[in-house]
A protein has these predicted regions:
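Alpha-helical transmembrane segments of integral membrane proteins
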Residues: 24, 72-291
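Transmembrane alpha-helical segments of polytopic membrane transport and secretion proteins
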Residues: 1-34, 272-291
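Hydrophobic alpha-helical transmembrane segments of membrane transport/permease proteins
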Residues: 31, 35, 39-73, 227-236
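Conserved beta-strand and immediately adjacent loop positions that scaffold enzyme active sites
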Residues: 27, 66, 268
Length: 291
C-alpha cells in the first residue's frame, strides 16, 4: 500500500465528514454540546445567583424567581447546575485527553516495536480489563482520597487501555505497509516513523473513541461524586447534587435537574460518537442519497 493510497483514504474520510455530520442525530448532538459549552462558559453571567449563596428560602419548588427551585440549604438549583457544567465538562475532557494520550503512546510503542515490550504492555491492559471500570475507579479513588482530582486520576487509570488496544492493532497494520517498511530501510528513526507515518493514520478511530469516552467519563465522574468519592460539599457538581436529591424525594427538583443535565450531555456525546464512527468506518459510513 502506497503513501498516495493512504492519503487518498484520508481525503475520502474528510469528504465524508461533512455529510456524515448532517445526520439528524449528529446535528442534535452538536447543538446540545454547543449549548452546554456556552452555558458553562457564560455561567457567571447567566446564573441568577451565586451557587454557594444560602440566602433564599429552602426547598422551594420551581418558580419565576427560581426556575429550578432551591435546595435544602436555600441555594438556587439553576445556578448550581450551570456552575456544575463548569466543573464536569472541562474535567471530563481533560480525563479523556490524558487517557487517550497515555493509551495511544503505549499502544504505538507496543505495536511498532512488538516483542517482549508488546507483551508487557498488553498484559498491563489485561490487568485493568480484569476489573469492572466503576469498581476499579471506586477502589483507586478511595485509596487516593476523596476529591475531584483523585476521582479524575482514577478514571484515567481505568480509561487508557482501550486506546492502547486500538492503536496497537492499527499501528501493527500500518507498520506492515510498504511505505513504512521503506522508511525503515532508508534509516528513518522509530520516533519519526511513528509520528510522521503511523500515528496520523490512527487519528480517526481514536477521535471516535474519545468522543464516546467523553460520555463515559461524565458518567464515571458523576458516579464517583454521587458515591462521595469525587466532588465534596459545597462544590456544585452534578453527581453530588443528584446524591443530595435522593435524600429528599418529596423535593423532586433537587435531583431531577442535575440528572437531566447528565442525561442530555451523555446522550449528545453518544450521538456525536456514533456519527463520527460512521464517517471513519467504511462499513457503516454515511452515504448521501444519490440524485
Amino acid at each position: 500500500m502506497s503513501v498516495g493510497i493512504l492519503r487518498a483514504r484520508s481525503r475520502t474520510a474528510a469528504r465524508r465528514l461533512h455529510p456524515g455530520l448532517r445526520q439528524p442525530l449528529a446535528v442534535v448532538g452538536v447543538v446540545i454540546v454547543a449549548a452546554w459549552i456556552v452555558l458553562a462558559v457564560f455561567a457567571p453571567l447567566i446564573a441568577p445567583a451565586d451557587p454557594l449563596e444560602q440566602t433564599f428560602p429552602a426547598s422551594v419548588g420551581p418558580s419565576w424567581d427560581h426556575l429550578f427551585g432551591t435546595d435544602e440549604l436555600g441555594r438556587d438549583v439553576l445556578s448550581r447546575v450551570l456552575y456544575g457544567a463548569r466543573v464536569t465538562l472541562p474535567l471530563s475532557l481533560l480525563v479523556v485527553v490524558l487517557a487517550a494520550t497515555v493509551g495511544a503512546l503505549v499502544g504505538a510503542v507496543a505495536g511498532y516495536f512488538r516483542g517482549p515490550l508488546d507483551g508487557l504492555c498488553m498484559r498491563s491492559t489485561d490487568l485493568v480489563f480484569a476489573f469492572p471500570p466503576i469498581i476499579l475507579a471506586m477502589v483507586v479513588a478511595a485509596v487516593l482520597g476523596r476529591s475531584l482530582q483523585n476521582a479524575a486520576i482514577a478514571i484515567v487509570i481505568v480509561a487508557w487501555p482501550p486506546y492502547a488496544r486500538i492503536v496497537r492493532g492499527l499501528v501493527m497494520s500500518v507498520g506492515d505497509t510498504e511505505y513504512v517498511q521503506s522508511a525503515r530501510l532508508l534509516g528513518a528513526s522509530a520516533r519519526r516513523a511513528l509520528v510522521r507515518d503511523v500515528l496520523p493514520n490512527v487519528a480517526g478511530p481514536v477521535l471516535v473513541l474519545m468522543t464516546l469516552d467523553l460520555a463515559t467519563a461524565i458518567l464515571l465522574l458523576s458516579g464517583l461524586s454521587f458515591l462521595g468519592l469525587g466532588a465534596q460539599p459545597p462544590q456544585a457538581e452534578w453527581g453530588s447534587m443528584v446524591a443530595v436529591g435522593t435524600q429528599y424525594f418529596q423535593w423532586w427538583w433537587m435531583g431531577t435537574f442535575p440528572g437531566l443535565a447528565i442525561f442530555t450531555v451523555v446522550v449528545a456525546f453518544n450521538f456525536l460518537g456514533d456519527s463520527l464512527r460512521d464517517v471513519f468506518d467504511p462499513q457503516t459510513s454515511y452515504r448521501a442519497p444519490e440524485e
